Each structure stands twice: as C-alpha cells, then as structure tokens.
Swiss-Prot record:
Regions annotated as coiled coil: 314-398, 856-885, 1150-1186
Protein name: Genetic suppressor element 1
Residue ranges with Acidic residues bias: 1085-1103
Biased composition (Basic and acidic residues): 137-149, 313-428, 530-554, 622-639, 939-952
Lineage: Eukaryota, Metazoa, Chordata, Craniata, Vertebrata
Chain segments carrying region Disordered: 1-97, 137-166, 299-477, 514-654, 796-840, 881-994, 1050-1108
Stretch forming the signal peptide: none
Keywords assigned by UniProt, alphabetized: Coiled coil
Ranges of compositional bias, category Low complexity: 66-79, 894-910, 918-930
Amino acid sequence: MSHEPKSPSLGMISTATRTTATVSPLTPSPLNGSIVPNVSPASQSAHSGFAAALRKLAKQAEEPRGSSISSESSPVSSPATNHSSPVSTPKRGPMGPVIVPPGGHSVPSTPPVVTIAPTKTVNGLWRSESRSVREVESVPHGVSRDRLSSEAASAQEKGGPTVPAHLIGNPYPFGLTPASVMQDSRFQPLNLPRQMPHAVPTASVPEEYLRGFRPYATAEELRMPSLPLGLDPATAAAAAAYYHPGYLPHPSFSHYRMDDPFCLSALRSPFYQLPAGGALPPLHPSAVHMHLPGVRYPGDLSHPSLSSLQSERLSERLQMEDELRQREREREREREKEREREAEREKEREREREREKELEREREREREREREKEREREREMERQKERAAREKAAESHYLTELHGLRGAPDDRAKPDRITSNRPEKTKESILTTPKPIQPGIHQSLNSTHHPVPSLSSAHGLYLGPGGAGPTSLTVATMLQRTEEERWLARQRKLRQEKEDRQYQVSEFRQQVLEQHLDLGRQGEIPDMNVEGHRPVPNHHEPSSRDRDRDRDSHPLLGAPPPLISPKHQHKDHAPPPPTTLWNPAALIETSTDSRRTLHDPPSLGHYDISRLPLPPSKHERHYNSEKLEEGSRKRDSLDKYPPIRPSGFSEPNTFLAELEKSTQSFLNQQRAPLSLSGPYGELSAGFKSSGPLKNLQGHSRLAPDTTLVYDEFLQQHRRAVSKLDLEERRRREAREKGYYYELDDSYDESDEEEVRAHLRRVSEQPPLKLDDSTEKVEFLEMFDLTTLAHREEMMEVKRKKRRRMLRERSPSPPTVQNKRPTPTPLLTRFTPEDMNNSPELEDKKRFLTIFSLNHITQQQRRDNERVEELLQAIKQKSVTLDTIRHNPHPLCRSPAAHSSDQSSQSPVQSEELLNGWPLSPSPSVSIPQPSADPLSISDQHRPLSDPPKPKDSSLPPALPDKCRANDSLPGKSSSLLNSLRQPPFAKESSVSVNGKTKPWENFIAEEFAQQFHESVLQSTQKALQKSKGGALVVLEQNHAVDSSVHYNIPELQSTPGRSKPHPHPPSSQPNGQHCPPQPSRQELSAEESEEEEEEDDTEEDEPSTSRWQGIEAIFEAYQEYAEEQSIERQVLHSQCRRLEAHHYNLSLTAEQLSHSMGELMAQKQKLAAERENLQAELEHFKKCLTLPQSPWSRAHFKGYPPR
C-alpha cells in the first residue's frame, strides 16, 4: 500500500486498521488487526517501531488489490489515528469501510495490522511474514488460521474475497493469542482509534467500519466480521447498519453461513462493495438496528451467521476487543488532551509572536512619526526662508506692481501657480504668493479676488482663510491628500507587499488631480496669466509638490476645508472688509469659467480637491491660451472688485504679513497638523490691516452670482466630512484602484494618535482670523458660543461691570457693610492716651505703615474730623472753596499747638476723610475711628493723592508736608490736601516745592489748615482746568521733595514712588495754586478718585470710598469668616458622611457581586466540564453510529465476482 509508509506512526497503525482488513481479510485478524502482528512490524506492538516497520513494508510491498482497498479504508482509521499513513490509506477506501474503527475495536486496534496488510508487503513479504507469524501465533488455532492467513494473502493479492478469519473460528481475531504481539499492537491501535474518533472524520470511521465488515468483499474486507464481534452496543449498531437487512443475510440465514463461510463472504461482498461514495452511509439508522437492535455486540448477528464458529471464542474476542477498545479510548483521550495542550502552547506562541509584531509595528509607526516631524520641521524652515525671500521681493515689487497688476494677466496666472504651491507648502506657497504678487501677484491677487480662476491661482496667494476658492480647495485637498499619503505609508508599514502599488495609487491620484486642476483651472488660471509669476511658482513648485506629498503623508486627518470658511467676508457680498481675509470666493468672477473651476474641484472628490492647487504650473500652461481673455475678464473683475490685494499691496509688508497670517490661520484650520499656521495668521492679519484692501473691497462688488459661486465654493470647503464618509471614499477608491483597503488599517492606534495630534495642533493654533462669518456665528450661538472678538468685547463689558461693582462694594459684602456701619464698639480697657504713651508705639506705627495705616493722635483725629466736615460742607455747597480760601481757619483751624507732624497727619487724614469716599480706590481711608488706637488709614490712597498736587508744586514745605500726609491719606484726599495747602504755601515758597525747605515740625496746625484748604481749592481748580499730567508731575515732585521730611510713617517717604499721578487729576488749573473756578468738591474727588480707575465710575464711586472702618470692622469680618467656615465645614462633613455611607453600601454590593460572580464562574466551569463530557460522549456515539462511506471493494471495481 503506497499509503502504508505513512502507516508506521501509531496513528497510522490505527489507520492500519483498514490495512489490517486488507491483509487479514482471510483471517479473523481483520477485526483485531492481528494481521499486523503476523508481520514482524506488527509484533512490534504498533509502536513507533511497529509503525516504522509498517512503513518499510509499505515501501517494499506491491499494492495488492485488497491492500489498496484496505489502504483506502485505512485512511479512515488513520485519520482517527492522525497519521500520515491514514491519509494515504483512504485510497484503500474499500477497506476503509471497516467498521471496527468506530468501535475502536479490532479494526482500529488492528491499525498496526492493517498498516502492514495494506502495505504492498502484504502481497509479498507480508504474506509470507504474516503467515509465519500467524503460524506461530495461530498455533493454538492450528491449520485453520494458517489457511486463513494464506488465503488472506492470496485474497489480498487477488483482491478476491476471503473467508473472514473469525469465520474460520480462530478464538482470537488473527488466531493470535491474546498475549500475541498482534494483540499488543492491536491494543495500541485500539487506543489510537479511540483517539481516532476525535481526529478522524466520520467518513474515515465509516471506512474503517466498512472495512471491518467488508471482509467479504475483499481479503481486507473480510475483517469486517470481526468488527461486529468487537462492537459496543453503539458500535454494534453502527456495524449493524452496515449489515443492512438487504445486504446482510438475516440471522435466519446464519445456518447457511455456518455451512459456507465463503458463501457468507459472497453474500456480503455486494453489500460491502457498495460504492465508496457511501451507499452504505445513507442507510437509515434503523438499518443498523435491524440485526442488532439491542445487541451489545454483533454477537447475535455473528452467532447466526457464524454458528459454525465457537460462540465462546466470539464472546472472548468481543471481550478482548472491548478491553482493547477501552484502553485505546483512554489513550486516545490522553493524546487528545496532549494535542489540545500543544495547540494551546502553539496559540500562545502565536500570540506572543503577534504581540512582538505589534510592538514592532508600533515602534515603526513611532519612527515614522518622528521622521514626519523632522520633515515637517525641515519644511518649515525652508518655508520660512522662502517666505523671507519672497517678502523681500514682494516689498520691492509691491508698489510698482500694484498698478501693473491689473494689466498683467500672466502674473495672475502665476499667482494661481503659487496657489498651487501653497497647497503643497502652505506657508511656503503663501510666501511664494507674495513674490508672485510682486510682479503679477498683485494683479493676480486682484484677479483672484475677482474671477474664480484668479482665485484659484490667487489661492496660493490667497492667504489661507480668505481663499475659500481653489486655495482652500487646495489646502483641503492637500490635507486630504496628505492624509491619504499617511494612510498609504501606514499601509506600507503594515503590508510591505502593497507598498509599490499604493505608492502608484497615490501618484496616480496626484496626476489625476493635476489633470483635473489643469482642466478645471484652465478657465481660472487664464485670468492670472502664469507667465509673469511662473518663475517664482516654478521655483517653488517642485518643492511645493513634494511638500504636498509630504503633507499628504501627514494629512490634517483629511480635515475638511476650514469651517471658518472665508465666507464671513461674503457676509455682505460686499468686498470683504479688510479685516476679513479676503475671500477669493467672494471676489470670484461669476464667469462661467471661474465657476466651473470652482465646481470642478469639488467634483474632483476630496482628494482631488485637496490636490487641485497642485498643478498651477500646468494650469498656467493651459491657461496661457485662455489667459488673455481671462486677463481681460479679470481686468473687468478688477475694475469691478478693485484688487483687494492692491490695497494690501500699498502696505506690502503688512499686507503680506496679514495675508500670510490669514492664510495660515486658514490652513491651520484646515490642517492643524501643518505648522504653517503661524504665517497664515499673519497673512490674514495683513489683510485686515491693509487699508488698501478696503479700497479694493469698496471697488469690488461681488457679482450677483458671486454669492452663489462663493457659497458653493465655500460649501465645498465648509462641508464637514465625517470620518465614515472619508472611510467610504477611501474604500471606494481602493476598489477602483485595485488595491485592498482594510478597515483595520485605517483604524489602528496611530489613527487615534493622529487625531490627538491633530487636536493638539488645532488647540495650539493661533486664533482663527475669520471668526465672524454670520453662518458660523449663528451656528455657534446655538451652543452659546461666540467668536473670539465678540467674546473679548463681552469680556471687556463684564470686566468693567466687575470693576464698577468692586469699586462700589461688591454685592456679597453689602450685608457685611450694612453690619459694619454699626459695629459694636470694641470694649477695651486702653484709652487712646494709654496707647499713645505705650513704649511700643513706634513699633506699632511701623507695623501700621505696613498696611498703609497711619497713627494719628487725638488732635489729628479732631483735625481730620474738621477737615472732613469742611469737605462735606463744600460737597454740599454750603461752603465754597472761595470762602475757605479767604477764610480757611474758621472752617478748620488746627490749633497751632499741634506739631506740624500732627497737623500734617491730621490734614492727611482729614483729607482722606474728605476725599476718602471718592478715593474709593483704596479701601481704607483714614477716617477717624473710635478705634482704640488713634490709627487711621490715611495712606492707602496715598498713591492717588500724589497726582492731585498742583503742578506748581510750589507748596511750601508745609504743603509737601500736607502732601505727604495726603499720601498717607487716600490718594484723592491727599491730592485735595495738596492742592488746598499748596496755594498758600506755594506762594510762600515755590522754592520749598521740595518740602525739604521746612521740616514738617515747623508747621503749625493753623498753617496746615490753611495750606490744606488752599490746596483743596487748588486741586479742585486744577482738576477742573489742568491736564492731569502736569498736576501729576508736580505732585510727584512735591512728594519726592516731601519724602525728605520723614514722618514716622515710612510710607510718606516712599510717597514719590507711591504717588500715582491721578491719571485724571481733577482738571487742575494750569497753576494749581490759583483755582478760580471752584469745582464742586464732589467733582474733584470724583475726578481724582475715579480717574485713577480706568473705569468711569466717578462720582458714584466717591461715596463708597474704602475707609478704615476701625478694628471692630476687622473683628466683625473675622467673625463672619469664622461663621462661614463653620457652616462650610458642617456642609462638607455631612456630605462626607453621606458619601461614606454610600461608599460603604457600594462596597457591600460589590462584595456580593463578586461572590455571585465567583459562584457563576464555578457554575460556568462546571457546565463547561459537563459540556465537554457530553461532547466527548457525543463524539463517541457519532463515531460508532456514522455510517462509513464505504468505498467499493477493489474486488468489485476490478470486476471480481462478489463471491
């Protein structure tokens, strides 16, 4: 049996089962497969040794007819065994039918035997060997076995049916004693068959069954009878199926068989010879039971048919076969498990390899990304260089070309080209654009604005956002293309095989795009005759195309054209305001050509669109012919829409910068990934800034269609493309181009990374310039969003409000303020006198100065109060500044006794008090408070106070003194004081402007009061008449001078620095000292205080001056704070407890769930185990019951009579 060589393996042995049938058909061995034992290999007990022997035999043997049959059946059994031999064996199909395999009894066990028998050896060597072996083993059985074996051999050679060995009556299948080698080998084979059931296809099993039964048909088939003997009830049933009532003689015919075993074989042969096709298998299961409905083994059947044989022997054999089968089953199970384990290991290894590959791919992607970034950086640098060069060139050409622009159609074409470049290197192209602009770009820009064609060409020029036209198309296209490229690159990594094809595809796409561009753009570009510009574009173009490619490699995720389509320009259809990036679309000529171009790109499909800009040079070429007419048209359009660019050109730098910016922002939008964003932003800015642009806009009126064109044009860009759409488009393209596009590839992790990178890029981009297209704004408003500019305005308003509110005590404080007005006086055993006499007074004063507070004596407080009253009176107009000036003392006379220090301080405070309210800026104004310490905040506003000082600042030292005091006072009050005091003192000594002339101590309270009043008058006058600046300067000087005089309060010393010129000192008279007009006190304070604050909260704020509320206020505030804290703590504690309880409940639930999970898992495992058992049983039953597809016996095919 040619297949035999494979048989050698144990699996083969089991396969051999079929073979056995062939060999031993004569002998009962077919069942047992003892035939093999006859062969020395068989005696090796079906081990690898045996298998090897079988193999040798197979090689040596010629293939007898029977053997071939057996080999065919053998495949069946061998499948069970999973040996190579079984595979070949199937050719012996006829033998295959041996039923034994299902039972796993003799045939399966026989495999070793079978193997040998099928082996060609069977005919020659096998026969002789088997004979000898048989003789040895058959000794007990005697001649009958010998004869059987010889017959079997001859039968095999002849292929004629032989009497089954079991018919002959050998107690053991092959006449071998149970201990005989045959049996050993058979045992293993049996085990193999056991495994066979799992591994072997049912067909193979049936073959073995058939083979077992077929002993009649062929020598090999003769073994079949043994099968029935060894069958389990299940197996028996299967066997019975083979003995279809029609085919098998009914038990009633057993006598007949008994009488003539050969007759039996003859009777059965036709049935066994059923075509391998499985004539038998179709038999209804009922057929199986026909003979052995409940019989455990075909014993019943065999008894009747073999009544001549000793039934004891049959039963013995059956028993033995059962045992063998049992053992085989176990062994097979073990082998099955082993195989499963092996498969598991293999799978694990596979997974490991997969993981390795994945990591490798990841690393590759990482490297790719790095390279990409590197390339991007290089491109960026190149672009910058080019931009610089272009800008220079543009500047020189700008003005000259502005006028020539219209005339130069060629230039226009060039811009187109530039545009194309731009897509490729957005930044670069933009830069490039400026250059072309120099000669023709201006005109092209203009034309761009007007005719769509120019737009396309201008696109390059057209600085990003503005250019919704081809440029944006280009950009979008480019982005998409970049995306595509990147995708392709990824594919390349994942599938090197596809690399070339995909590259070609992308190339092809680019070519197609270019063609599209050429065709579609010809109309447009003609407007911009490329000639003039071409040189620049050309020199950029190659790189631009490359750049395009690069970009493709990292598309902007195929970002659709920027949402902020330049449409906002379109808003009014009026030429876009200079601020907006000019929207080429808006200027688009309505000419059919231009429109066609616009539409064409969209038709191109996103890739095409993205690429459209690429071919400018080609476009230009095409355009040349059309350029002339286009040029004229453009000129018209220029007239219609004066070149926006020209206006921009007038300020070439700005315009370019702005253009660049806008383009950049536009591009950024489109392709956040591109680093170009910066320049484009500039461009757009340029657009906005360029006044000339405005002029252009004014001229340019969009043609009625423009809107349409513009809209459609924009629509292409604006249309958001969903990822799914992109995916679909790519897939379609892949289908058309003939490469395989896998969804998985498109969505690997790198996609997520790209998206993340894209988002990062988008978020890092400078704010977009075109942020106010009505469409966009309306859309955003739906989500309570607004444009950045509008947001800034709103924020400004809010800030003003907030500032006002803060100035006016914020709403929440109001309650506190309400309380504060009536603070319960703090009880203290210290009187102000005690406090003033305390040894640490100096330290305390220093401490107070830290908080801009002044220590005031009782006298000072009184003075302050007086001043406050005076100011109040002035405010209420009961007293006028004039009266004060003429009569200062009466109003507030400070006792001369007061040291100038005191006087100065008190004025300060009083001034603070007076102005205090208005001064609101500093919360604490020194207002005399009942506070235990005669401390009041006088300094807080001091900085403010400085400004009010009269310009003249010719205050005598006293005045500076006062100023200083004022310093300590809230700024306003101090300014008032200064102005009040200044007049007299100024007169006294303008020289003493630097209060240095006199030490403060020299001043008398009265003088101080006078000075104070005068300074107040002056400051008011100043405030009214004088520009804040002068007064401030003077004040500062005064303060600086004064600083020489040292109050205890260090703050005074720093006054100059502190003094914060009132930005709006009350309009002070040029000469602050003479204040003829007496602005109402209110005005003064209001002006001073509020002017300081940018906000215009003048008079209203005055009342809400921050004043020193006294220590009580502090305590009160602290108390409130403590209360709030405790409330907050309570809330948090309760919340915390609630959460803890919740958490506890959740953890309990989690525990329960984990328990139930564990139980479920256990049950699942149990079920799985049960299922496995059931499955195993099922398999077993299947093996037993499936009818083998019985190949016709060789004899049948070769025309041997059935016998």
